[in-house]
From Swiss-Prot:
It comes from Arabidopsis thaliana (Mouse-ear cress). InterPro entries: NAD(P)-bd_dom_sf, NmrA-like, NmrA-type/Isoflavone_red_sf, PCBER-like. GO terms for biological process: lignan biosynthetic process. The keyword RNA-binding does not apply. Oxidoreductase involved in lignan biosynthesis. Catalyzes the NADPH-dependent reduction of phenylcoumaran benzylic ethers. Converts dehydrodiconiferyl alcohol (DDC) to isodihydrodehydrodiconiferyl alcohol (IDDDC), and dihydrodehydrodiconiferyl alcohol (DDDC) to tetrahydrodehydrodiconiferyl alcohol (TDDC). Plays an important role in the biosynthesis of secondary metabolites. In addition to the 8-5'-linked neolignan DDC, can reduce the 8-8'-linked lignans, pinoresinol, and lariciresinol, but with lower activities. The gene is PCBER1. Its EC number is 1.23.1.-. NADP(+) binds at residues 11-17, 36, 45, 137. It is an enzyme of class 1 (oxidoreductase). The active site is at 133 (proton acceptor). This is Phenylcoumaran benzylic ether reductase 1.
Amino acid sequence: MTSKSKILFIGGTGYIGKYIVEASARSGHPTLVLVRNSTLTSPSRSSTIENFKNLGVQFLLGDLDDHTSLVNSIKQADVVISTVGHSLLGHQYKIISAIKEAGNVKRFFPSEFGNDVDRVFTVEPAKSAYATKAKIRRTIEAEGIPYTYVSCNFFAGYFLPTLAQPGATSAPRDKVIVLGDGNPKAVFNKEEDIGTYTINAVDDPRTLNKILYIRPPMNTYSFNDLVSLWENKIGKTLERIYVPEEQLLKQIIESSPPLNVMLSLCHCVFVKGGHTSFEIEPSFGVEASELYPDVKYTTVDEILNQYV
């Protein structure tokens, strides 16, 4: 049996990063996380750091702005997974440069973990973030770096507790806002499952230089069907308030961050069908639940039970 790749994470203590780091360590990959000293000692990160230590994760001190430490860290790994946050997406050119200099990386997973940025229609402010991710893709390809792009669509833990209701703190009990006509299908995946599928792809030749779409059939719902599922669970019919696209676009322009970001993402997915408006072609992509049928992913139906 071949040994498992050694994986270096950059941005591993962030929202989605910590789930993927955990999946890596639990599956037996030697797991390294690049951290700043300030992160190691940050009270807000202490439980994540402690959890990583218990899982045998190794910490490497370094920084995206310290090229030498970046190159030295990358030289210790076979695979690099970036899960840097929104504000650091553009800094990934530094990772690409360091990967080129190190010369040993078998695969790079840039910070994607959302929509497929090459196959979406978006408006600002989401448009700029998607454009940055697309430029990162083109640079990776131009430099000849082996890659996998993970398109995991929506994080279930972020959108389902409120049924994707902008500004809400809990799931609706009386009225529900439906953006557009509620018919385009969206995909919601549990963060732990995103971690599992991502790590399964690391040493899989079928995902090399491909987009890994996490689009399990049981987690793919139109918004209307999602509301109906929720209504069945709470035993109540909600008043559905449909917001036309023109009204939503006006609201995006008039809103401040982070609401405008959330609304522009929702416009892309719930109005324009950004998750499912295209077929996954073998020339560019593969689907995770088809590649890894043994993974028992958590369904949307199961996830919603905890919010009843």
